[in-house]
């Protein structure tokens, strides 16, 4: 079983289930709208035009200005899928971003990115993926419109070309 192409579809299925809970709750829908539709709009907007955003660094409290991209959002959404309690913040973060307020989204994306960069799990993950699943890391048209799109598969396939096998 090659797992290379399951990331995008699985994330979209999990998001659909999670965000449908908000859409089906009158109180959540009244406050947050349709988080799935808003997420798609935010991603499309950021793919076309990444936006400079000033946010507060969660570790230092320092204000930093960087450009937020669709990849920041997709990466954050992907990791929140593994943390359902924290994932409850997604509708609020998506709502803010849909209104052009990206600071909280960027702060959390950068915090998550920093945590991942400091962990050893990426090396272990790539060792397994590159040994067992590299052949299944192919771009698929049906993943193009998902939250992750094909960027993750392209990135992992590229890393696997140089990754030691064994």
What is the meaning of each model-derived region?
Residues 38-166:
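Alpha/beta-hydrolase fold active-site neighborhood
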């Amino acid at each position: 079983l090659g797992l290379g192409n399951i990331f995008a579809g699985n994330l979209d299925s999990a998001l659909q289930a999670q965000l449908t809970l908000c859409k089906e709750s009158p109180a959540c829908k009244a406050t947050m709208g349709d988080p799935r539709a808003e997420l798609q709009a935010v991603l499309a907007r950021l793919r076309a035009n990444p936006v400079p955003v000033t946010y507060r660094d969660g570790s230092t409290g320092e204000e930093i200005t960087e450009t937020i991209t669709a990849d920041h959002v997709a990466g954050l959404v992907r990791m929140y899928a593994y943390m359902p309690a924290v994932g409850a913040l997604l509708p609020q973060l998506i709502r803010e971003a849909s209104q052009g307020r990206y600071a909280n989204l960027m702060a959390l994306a950068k915090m998550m990115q920093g945590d991942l960069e400091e962990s050893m799990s990426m090396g272990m993950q790539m060792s397994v993926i590159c040994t067992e699943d590299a052949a299944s890391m192919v771009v698929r048209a049906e993943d193009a419109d998902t939250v992750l799109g094909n960027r993750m598969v392209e990135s992992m396939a590229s890393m696997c070309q140089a990754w030691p096998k064994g």
